Amino acid sequence: MAAWSPAAAVPLLRGTRRLPLLHWAQRMFASQTEAELKVTQILKEKFPRATAIKVTDISGGCGAMYEIKIESEEFKEKRTVQQHQMVNQALKEEIKGMHGLRIFTSVPKH
């Protein structure tokens, strides 16, 4: 039987994106990153009637790709493409430094 070594355990401690599983566990229970908080704050200012805003760094921690979910009355009677354009316009300066952005918009159901 081979001796155990830390190097042998590395494959067991990796997540699906080749990042340590410990990183994913810490991220799952952590609050928002500074960049996520910044984007969230901008969206709160641009969409004051929003009932829900969630910004998630989906790049693995480098801040290059985000998923944004926002629910707001401001989107009422607008097509999805128009809603997404509103979000893009609100974040136009931040988008310059991003690799990608996933946007999910909705209108609150009463």
Swiss-Prot record:
Its main location: mitochondrion. SUPFAM superfamilies: BolA-like (SSF82657). GO terms for cellular component: mitochondrial matrix; mitochondrion. Pfam families: BolA. It comes from the Eukaryota. It is found in: Mitochondrion. Keywords: Mitochondrion. InterPro entries: BolA, BolA-like_sf, Mt_Fe-S_assembly_factor. Disulfide bonds: none annotated. Interacts with NFU1. Belongs to the BolA/IbaG family. Acts as a mitochondrial iron-sulfur (Fe-S) cluster assembly factor that facilitates (Fe-S) cluster insertion into a subset of mitochondrial proteins. Probably acts together with NFU1. This is BolA-like protein 3. The gene is BOLA3.
